[in-house]
Swiss-Prot record:
The active site is at residues 188, 272, 353. The lineage of its organism: Bacteria, Bacillati, Actinomycetota, Actinomycetes, Kitasatosporales. This is Putative RNA-guided DNA endonuclease. An RNA-guided dsDNA endonuclease. When guided by an RNA derived from the right-end element of its insertion sequence element (IS), cleaves DNA downstream of the transposon-associated motif (TAM). Cleaves supercoiled and linear DNA in a staggered manner 15-21 bases from the TAM yielding 5'-overhangs. Binds reRNA, an approximately 150 nucleotide base sRNA derived from the 3' end of its own gene, the right end (RE) of the insertion sequence (IS) plus sequence downstream of the IS. Residues 202-239, 373-402 are annotated as: Disordered. It comes from Streptomyces pristinaespiralis. The keyword Ribosomal protein does not apply. Residues 204-225 have a biased composition (Basic and acidic residues).
Amino acid sequence: MMQQVKRAFKYRFYPTDEQAAELSRTFGCVRLVYNKALEGRTRAWYGEQRRVSYVQSSAALTEWKKTEELAFLSEVSSVPLQQALRHLQTAFANFFAKRSKYPRYKSRKKSRASAEYTRSAFTWRNGQLTLAKTAEPLDIRWSRPLPEGAEPTTVTVSRDRAGRWFVSLLCEDTITPAPATTAAVGIDAGITSLVTLSTGEKITNPKHERRDRARLAKAQRDVSRKAKGSANRKKARRKVARVHARITDRRCDFLHKLSTRLVRENQTVVIEDLTVRNLLKNGKLARAISDAAWTELRSMLEYKCAWYGRELVVIDRWFPSSKLCGTCGTVRGKLPLNVREWTCDCGAVHDRDVNAARNILAAGLAASACGDGIRPQRESSRTGRSSVKQEPQRATAGIPRL
């Protein structure tokens, strides 16, 4: 059955000098309003144990605009400023619900520069987008068309560290489920092989960062040789950002193609609930694990399975997938990472990764059949339940990566 989802379509655009200046001012004002509101909420929370609502923050913004030193806030569109306060409200709601850490201040150099416009702050006419406080429509490079008849409800403009400008259009889209199939696959994440499938196929890790490591190192050396605060250092930093952007784009493209293929070919996809944050504490493997981007792959699998009528099952991270003999069910005592093949007492010879993928699939199918839980829990291994089923949230709960 077809379903309606909110989907973001991201495009690159090239602003005029006037548009770039206006948007840069807007980015600065958005960052200032966010940080001042966060400062006020922090004083209220840590000083008085008092929570500040969005309405109170919005009233404070009105007062700021009346002061002489912050009168320039009235020169940009008010909608991005209000949206910044809404995002801060969401950040605090997640903090109080213990879903995230305490909100952090936005940095001019490190944070992504962005501004969000709702329907009242932009004009969409004949496929052209004009933002508030700008006279001309944006010069957007339409790399793919919007859904037929779709109109954006929210527009987010951003600029990355490499100096590239992007616009993201949030639209309603109709998703048709993929044709049903009986195939199922278990996925074991790795470093040498990015993923190993229960079919025995190994997807080689492209190692995107390593391909540009020499270029990145040279660009970083150039930065270190420039005087701090100089224009040349700023140019050198932008070159570093361009290399990072190249790596990120290449990685994202590969993961999208891989996740789409896995979802299209299989009715059930089973993965492990890996805690990447803890794995990154391994100094020798941290760079390789970060480059593999397992979390990003999982995120793509989650929303694509939800879109196309597939089932995603996540088994417990403590399930001994590599040490469990898929033939007799015996669990081996120790299995160091350097051991890629091992022989069970029953005589079965196992490839470490293929055996793990097959055990993951078997555990996932068992969890799917019995409906064992909703979300992975660390305690499940102590209570004898080695795997659980996870129902991914619908894409309408947030904007997926595209």
